[in-house]
Amino acid sequence: MEQRISIVTLGVRDLGAARAFYDALGWKIANEGEEAANIVAYDLHAMTLCLYLWDKLAGDAQVPPVGEGFRGVVLAYNVPGKEDVAPVLAEAEAAGGRIVKPAQDAFWGGHSGIFADPEGHLWEVAWNPFAPLGQRGEFQWKGCED
């Protein structure tokens, strides 16, 4: 198995509200029409983020659709500079997200904050001085070589 992720699918209870949030962040939907009524896809650099109804996603995975509170997953959005963290958090809040942890220096030497989207999915916005981003925003654990 190759070391990569193709799609991250987030289970949502309100597909319209979830789509409105990501649309408000300026993300462009990759699918339209009848297909987008059931699953919304956003093409990212080298992967896709999908939004799918919570119960349908659980049914497809053949697991019970239960779960509240921390789900054991935090998605990360890395930025090129320390000064970029707070504006991205503000953009998420303006789009309807909730700030969970304001921008602050992190124990590991970077700077980060966390917001929750309207469905409660956690997103860390981080600047990591030890892993500079590539020209297109690509992230690698030890930094991208351009």
What are these regions (language model features)?
Residues D14-I29:
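Amphipathic alpha-helical segments
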Residues V12-L15, A106-W108:
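Conserved beta-strand-loop-alpha-helix junction that forms the acyl-donor binding cleft
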Residues M1-S6, K28-K82, A86-A116, P129-D146:
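Vicinal oxygen chelate
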Residues A18-Y22, A92, G120:
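Conserved active-site tyrosine of GNAT-family acetyltransferases
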Residues E124-V125:
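Short glycine-/small-residue motifs
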Residues L10-R13, G81:
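Short, surface-exposed ligand-recognition loops at beta-strand->loop->(often short) alpha-helix junctions
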Residues T9, G16, A86:
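Conserved catalytic core of two-component sensor histidine kinases
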